[in-house]
Amino acid sequence: MTNLTLALDAMGGDHGPQVTVPAALQALRLHPKLSLLLVGDETQISPYLSSAEIDVRSRITLVHTTEVVRMDDKPATALRHAKNSSMRLAIEQVRDGMADGCVSAGNTGALMAMAKVLLKMLPGVDRPALVSCLPAINGKPVYLLDLGANIQCDYDTLFQFAVMGSVLSEAVDKIARPKVALLNVGIEECKGNGDVQQAAQLLLHTPQLNYAGFIEGDEIYSGKVDVIVCDGFVGNITLKTSEGIARLLVHQLKQGLAKGFVVRILARLLAPRIQKVLNQMNPDHYNGASLLGLRAVVVKSHGNADEHAYIQAISLAYTEAKRRLPEMIKDRLESILLDINS
């Protein structure tokens, strides 16, 4: 396999190089064929590199800049004025062919605006979609999109999201003919607004997609489908609510295991199994939201991601670049549109 290079916005997120650089080093250890461009303030990045092994350090290139997009910057402002920011320069590395993908924990709106302008959209895609992986009861991953990039979506946009989500599931998890569903207020054919209804009709008449109909919120984690499509308003609320509930359950489980002598003894005996369950429930385990529909790979990490979570985002970008996800989406869309228009 040929080597891959990712550009990292090392200054992005709540913690900057304190998290991004140690995570980058660990990602390089996990992926021997990976090289990284660390974009940011060299004086802040370099101290974290001093103890790295020679093999790891040799696969890092620094791209120096002191400018940073703030988390409260408006997308239009960042696009116009942050010309030398670590976020923009990281994306430009991809645009200029120096990197195969980009990872940032910075301002989501600014990242989307810059990526859309600098990398452009794939033919047949009107808007980029944010998509992330969720856990399911049966252990399979479930992809939910859109997560907030597009508050309102017409039926054609929802259809495009379904295609892109299906290809993502195939590429990353190697699932043959992933089941795709539309998130709705009921499973009956008559339920939902006009755009959801029209998107359903398009999907029903697209044999290249394995459309499974409507799905309700209480079935998101059932594992019955592989891809769930909705507009960004619904998707963002769903994701944030899920993360909050997961943290609540982890907190309550830890509290419950700390009460009572017998319970504490059992907790120690079952510690490895309990920790595995806690890890599976932890939202950081699924960190990394992909911006689908662009001509190159861009992954958005949580702004407050810790080192482990940021490694997940880097690994996701690595997998998507290795599988050539944008090219797969482009080819699938072209094939489907050809069938529709024939």
Curated annotation (Swiss-Prot):
EC top class named in words: transferase
Pfam family, one: FA_synthesis
E.C. designation(s): 2.3.1.274
SUPFAM superfamilies xref list: Isocitrate/Isopropylmalate dehydrogenase-like (SSF53659)
Any single Gene Ontology cellular-component annotation: cytoplasm
Residue runs in coiled coils: none
InterPro entries cross-referenced by the UniProt entry: FA_synthesis, Phospholipid_synth_PlsX-like
GO molecular function, one term: phosphate:acyl-[acyl carrier protein] acyltransferase activity
GO BP annotations listed: fatty acid biosynthetic process; phospholipid biosynthetic process
Compartments where located: Cytoplasm
Reactions mediated catalytically: a fatty acyl-[ACP] + phosphate = an acyl phosphate + holo-[ACP]
Similarity comment text for this entry: Belongs to the PlsX family.
NCBIfam families documented for this protein: plsX
Function: Catalyzes the reversible formation of acyl-phosphate (acyl-PO(4)) from acyl-[acyl-carrier-protein] (acyl-ACP). This enzyme utilizes acyl-ACP as fatty acyl donor, but not acyl-CoA.
Name of the protein in question: Phosphate acyltransferase
Organism per entry: Shewanella amazonensis (strain ATCC BAA-1098 / SB2B)
Gene name as annotated: plsX
